[in-house]
Amino acid sequence: MKALVSGIVDLSTIDYPKKASAVIFLYGCNMKCPYCHNLKFMLEHKRGMTVEEIFNDIDFLFADAIVISGGEPTLQKDAVIEIARYAKEKGFPVKIDTNGTHPEVIEELIKNKLIDYVAIDVKCRFDKYKEFVKCREDGEEIKNKILKIIDLCKKNNVFVECRTTFVPKVMDEEDIEDIAKTVKDCDLYAIQQFEPKDAYDEEFKKLPMPKENELRELGKIAKKYIDNVVIRTINGTFEI
């Protein structure tokens, strides 16, 4: 079988915490986040590749982990499972980035011991989902799916991170507090700095980038509910 691939990064030091990773970006997404920095690139780049071709395309001189990202990689269930299996056979830890809408794919990865790290993008407060990311499911349905993934990970010793890109004038402190309360059982919660220049939506390019001290204050709010909280900025990752 062939996976639809948008791009491959041979070496990243930010996508898998504390590891140097190769990142495989799978084509396709079921959301349209206005701040997304991958969407335009993904829509313009697509090629069919076998798993062997994908791994032959990666220079493993420095990478010691594999990240499967997107788009939304779980839309290509068979490809995700085959890539993860191939990576594990080669001895690599595997991380997947997901919006949480397909817990059944994560469940199969966990059941077959093909995944070590799950990072879930929590886009906004769940009651704002339909409006904010233009998805089919309502926020309550997505919330339940995300909570199912967190529960699966916790029961099977798979590290689970939740993360939110904080967009000023669209989100506020109450949003972060509501999200943190909801995903309080995750192993790590990351608040990420919005970068307007990379936004897919032209209107979002006009919004300000949140200041680091603002993110730190938001991190303190999240810390009331979650032990491990970090902020991710253009200057690096910082524990709260």
UniProtKB/Swiss-Prot annotation:
It is an enzyme of class 1 (oxidoreductase). The keyword Ribosomal protein does not apply. SUPFAM superfamilies: Radical SAM enzymes. Its cofactor is [4Fe-4S] cluster. It catalyses: glycyl-[protein] + reduced [flavodoxin] + S-adenosyl-L-methionine = glycin-2-yl radical-[protein] + semiquinone [flavodoxin] + 5'-deoxyadenosine + L-methionine + H(+). The keyword Oxidoreductase applies. S-adenosyl-L-methionine binds at Y35, C36, H37, G71, F126, D127, K128. PROSITE patterns: RADICAL_ACTIVATING, RADICAL_SAM. It comes from the Archaea. Its EC number is 1.97.1.-. Keywords: 4Fe-4S, Iron, Iron-sulfur, Metal-binding, Oxidoreductase, S-adenosyl-L-methionine. Residues 14-232 form the Radical SAM core domain. Belongs to the organic radical-activating enzymes family. PANTHER family: GLYCYL-RADICAL ENZYME ACTIVATING ENZYME MJ1227-RELATED (PTHR11228:SF27), RADICAL SAM DOMAIN PROTEIN (PTHR11228). This is Putative glycyl-radical enzyme activating enzyme MJ1227. The lineage of its organism: Archaea, Methanobacteriati, Methanobacteriota, Methanomada group, Methanococci.
